[in-house]
């Protein structure tokens, strides 16, 4: 089974988590992204899928600006939102991850392709 869909542009790891009393908590920006991402999953009727198989994920990052960025700074917020939105059980199921820089897009987005790995 293969899923192709688009999710909102996430905050970077650095702006998503904050240190508080010697532990890390989700920032206001991170909490808002989680709400927006789960709403998008519901809109796409992908919430509650609870995929339990091993997965291959391909991401195309289409940023909102031309600012330079590291491709590995945006996966965490997205993957956590997919877990909380119950698209999959946990992001540890991802055995293969391919991340590609796309083109500047108004508002930014991430194009996602998720494939179930056949064992």
Regions found by a protein language model. Give the residues of each.
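Acidic, proline/glycine-enriched N-terminal capping motif
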Residues: 1-119
């Amino acid at each position: 089974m293969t899923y192709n869909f688009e999710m909102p542009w996430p905050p970077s790891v650095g702006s998503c988590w904050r240190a508080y009393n010697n532990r890390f908590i989700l920032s206001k920006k991170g909490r808002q992204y989680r709400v927006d991402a789960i709403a998008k999953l519901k809109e796409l009727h992908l919430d509650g899928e609870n995929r339990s198989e091993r997965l291959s994920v391909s991401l195309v990052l289409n940023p909102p600006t031309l600012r330079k960025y590291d491709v590995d700074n945006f996966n965490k917020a997205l993957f956590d939102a997919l877990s909380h939105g119950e698209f999959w059980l946990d992001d540890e199921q991802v055995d293969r991850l391919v991340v590609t820089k796309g083109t500047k897009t108004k508002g930014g987005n991430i194009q996602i392709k998720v494939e179930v790995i056949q064992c």
